[in-house]
Amino acid sequence: MAKEKGLTPQSQDFSEWYLEVIQKAELADYGPVRGTIVVRPYGYAIWENIQQVLDRMFKETGHQNAYFPLFIPMSFLRKEAEHVEGFSPELAVVTHAGGEELEEPLAVRPTSETVIGYMWSKWIRSWRDLPQLLNQWGNVVRWEMRTRPFLRTSEFLWQEGHTAHATREEAEEEVRRMLSIYARLAREYAAIPVIEGLKTEKEKFAGAVYTTTIEALMKDGKALQAGTSHYLGENFARAFDIKFQDRDLQVKYVHTTSWGLSWRFIGAIIMTHGDDRGLVLPPRLAPIQVVIVPIYKDESRERVLEAAQGLRQALQAKGLRVHLDDRDQHTPGYKFHEWELKGVPFRVELGPKDLEQGQAVLASRLGGKETLPLAALPEALPGKLVAFHEELYRRALAFREAHTRKVDTYEAFKEAVQEGFALAFHCGDKACERLIQEETTATTRCVPFEAEPEEGFCVRCGRPSAYGKRVVFAKAY
């Protein structure tokens, strides 16, 4: 069936399926520069819905939007040694402008900790200036060697939050608060189950004291880091001399955080829920929640379209995102296929016989059709969209549970990471972690916050566990 509809089956080649569905569902296309993509209106509408949800949650927690320059002096990046070392291989650098060589090369923003740190050093003087709670919506450039649409691109859209606090306690509370917002976005809006946890020293953000993350499992058994929140301690404050006078007139360094989520979240939605017929979009983020496909011949066209338009208005009055596909140049069958490919949760089929009987056919993207009274649809569909979300989440959670294994031997570990998450003990040594990656291509995803305390011995080297609980390992995007 997938072949007939022009998609490679997931079981045959998941990577090829992913690339095909992005193009055929008109989410994105390849840009003229290697590693760049053009996000088409349907794909951008998903990003806008993600933005709206996050922006509301950020503002509810006291954050304000701001914008900082795209060009950053290279000297800024060099001020934080770990930071520049971590980003150097991915930097795009401007050396000439206006036909002349620049006095100082400028990095094209890979992330904004440095330029925001510089500005805070000018703005923050007293405890009264704290906390600083900022968010920036924008683009960043990281010159990735191996690119894949939405997951790794040379330029991508994201939000990056940056906050400064008087105490470590306040900053750490912020780190967890923002991670929980990302987890809410995943679970409550994208229907994606995620594991919240701590990154290992090897996997943490360059320049952070520690990094927290939400990790999701894709249908091919690979993990995807869907959002991160970092405690930066005084690292950037010391590098940029961001000091304040506290209530006792003591001069101290601020404690900073940063946190970000990019359009790779769209990739997570595609790979968590999609099937051989195309996308399956979670209703709360879908650009179109209900598509109405009128079915008519010339003599019934006007009557059917009038009823379809009335239904659209009634559904929109309930706050639903509705599209009426009244194109004459395509058959109903073509339209059914197109909207299945694009992952619209519900399709309403409305023909002259349906009108005579005062009913319509409702088809779910999760499978199954039912006939309902036309007048009942505006009341029924909001609840059906909730049930659709819950079923989508249930299926994704069941998949994750079926592809998560506790392992205690390296042989069992190697088998487990071929299929999904392996829960294993680890010694915490970076060299041991690197060897595991070289030998299996699996990496540590996180030390889960919710995992039960448990003692054991490293799955590879046999030394005692460093974390007092099992670590999540997987192959990853």
Swiss-Prot record:
Pfam families: HGTP_anticodon, ProRS-C_1, tRNA-synt_2b. It comes from Thermus thermophilus (strain ATCC BAA-163 / DSM 7039 / HB27). One of its GO terms (cellular component) is cytoplasm. Disulfide bonds: none annotated. Keywords: Aminoacyl-tRNA synthetase, ATP-binding, Cytoplasm, Ligase, Nucleotide-binding, Protein biosynthesis. GO terms for molecular function: ATP binding; proline-tRNA ligase activity. Coiled coil: none annotated. InterPro entries: aa-tRNA-synt_IIb (IPR002314), aa-tRNA-synth_II (IPR006195), aa-tRNA-synth_II/BPL/LPL (IPR045864), Anticodon-bd (IPR004154), Anticodon-bd_dom_sf (IPR036621), Pro-tRNA-ligase_IIa (IPR002316), Pro-tRNA-ligase_IIa_arc-type (IPR004499), Pro-tRNA_ligase_II_C (IPR016061). It catalyses: tRNA(Pro) + L-proline + ATP = L-prolyl-tRNA(Pro) + AMP + diphosphate. Catalyzes the attachment of proline to tRNA(Pro) in a two-step reaction: proline is first activated by ATP to form Pro-AMP and then transferred to the acceptor end of tRNA(Pro). Belongs to the class-II aminoacyl-tRNA synthetase family. ProS type 3 subfamily. It is an enzyme of class 6 (ligase). Homodimer. It is found in: Cytoplasm. It comes from the Bacteria. Its EC number is 6.1.1.15. This is Proline--tRNA ligase. NCBIfam families: proS_fam_I (TIGR00408). SUPFAM superfamilies: C-terminal domain of ProRS (SSF64586), Class II aaRS ABD-related (SSF52954), Class II aaRS and biotin synthetases (SSF55681). GO terms for biological process: prolyl-tRNA aminoacylation. Consists of three domains: the N-terminal catalytic domain, the anticodon-binding domain and the C-terminal extension.
